[in-house]
Amino acid sequence: MGRIIAVANQKGGVGKTTTSINLSACLAEAGQKVLVVDVDPQGNTTSGLGVDKNNVENTIYELMLGECTVEECIITNVLDNLDVMPSNVNLAGAEIDLIGVDEREYILHKEINKVRDNYDFVIVDCPPSLSMLTVNAMTASDTVLVPIQCEYYALEGLSQLIHTINLVKKRLNPDLEMEGVVFTMYDARTNLSLQVVENVKENLKQTIYKTIIPRNIRLAEAPSHGVPINIYDSKSAGAESYRLLADEVIHRGEDE
């Protein structure tokens, strides 16, 4: 049975989508069968994996409204070992369209469960907000991975996110756990990055991944080319760090 990991942080610009794309790609590169579920209406994970988000017939939006099956929503073999359930701006309307729908928080849970046995990992990219879509993603997931940018306001809003995770666990998904925290955009040249890492480690009781994702120009360039970092620049610091993170994620599952 595949592990379902939601990548979430309502604070934008923390490397959430970058992590969703590149962790997924590096898991696939390591021989894991991966499904990427893009639940962000911006659709940046979809386009960052080379899929034209404005030219797909079925997206998460159609799936949630019952207009297509989960199999019809999946684009297969976007990369070796990697499939995608795409998203685009239409998904922004789901919040209103699903008002009054019974058990709407469980829609993704029910649909993903139909195919989870086909995969080793299902990576769910959440929107940068604590919305119905985020709740849907968490209700469908086993764990939540939280990227935190190495900057002054790193912990801003994190307590609210953890509160939401605990609320979903209490009311909707009793098996939901924290996968852990991963530091992103680390700049070894600055004292601030080091201070942020030390501060978070001192104040956060959650699991923290050893791998730290550096601030890397090649990571920033890759999405505009529609490929993950391990394909865009296989030997870059960004590619190596996401390979290490993927290895940690794989072995954490084996250790449990």
Predicted regions mapped to residue ranges:
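P-loop NTP-binding core
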Residues: 1-256
